Amino acid sequence: MKLIESLRVKEKAYIEKLENGLTVIIIPKNTTNKKYIIWGTNFGSIDNHFIMPNTNEEVYIPDGVAHFLEHKMFEQSNGTNSLDTLMALGIDANAYTTNDHTAYLFECTDKFYEGLDELMDYVQNPYFTDENVEKEKGIIGQEIRMYDDDPGWQLYMQILDCLYKKNEIKIDIAGTVESISKITPDVLQKCYDTFYHPSNMVMVICGDFVPEEILEEVKKRLKPKQNQGEIKRIYEAEENGINKKYNEKVK
C-alpha cells in the first residue's frame, strides 16, 4: 500500500488500487472508538450520456437516475431494507447523491464488521422489479414536489439556470416528475453495471484498524470482477456568456 502522510496535520493514509480497479483508502486512527466507512461511485446527476465500456453502446438516460438508483439500493429481494438492518445493529447509516457522485456510508463504535457485511452486500446486489421501481417513482415524486416548495433550493437552481446554457450542472439532482417517469428497471441495471463497477468506485475507511488487515476483510467481501477501464462520459459543450439575466418563478 502507498503511504501518504501530512506532518502539518499529523495524519496518514494508506492507498491501494485493487486488480478490479477499486481504490481503497485507509486512515488509521487509534485515538477514537468510532469507525467510519464511505463507499462512493463516480456517478451523479451530470452523467446522463455515456458509452458502456463492455459493449460500446451509447446510452442516454433520463434526468434523476443516479438519485433514483441510490434510493433503490437499500431494498433487498427478501423484503428487508438494508438501512433498517444497519440501524437495528446500532449503526448510523446514510447515503447521498450529488452532481458527480453517489455515496453509501456508516459510522459506529461497535459491530463494524456486521455493518461491513451489510454494506458490501446491498451495494453489490441491487434488486430492481417493475413493481418496486413504480412504487419508488411516487416516493421520489413527493420529494421533488417538496423541493419545489423550498425557496432556498429554488433560488439555487434558478441561479444555475441563469448562469449556464447547456452545462449538466443545471440538472436537478432528483430530476423532475416527468423525467423519473421514464426510468425502468432496465435503465437502472445499465447504469448500475456501468457506474457501480469497482473500477469507478472509491472506498474510504477510518478508525482503529491495521491497514493490511482491514484491506483483506474488504477483499474477502468483494465479488470477482475484471477491471473495466474508464467510462466515456459525454457532456454538452458550454457556450460563452450567461444564459439569462434573471429568472422569475411564481407559485
Feature locations, PLM:
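Acidic/histidine-enriched segments that form metal/cofactor-coordinating
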Residues: 2, 77-191
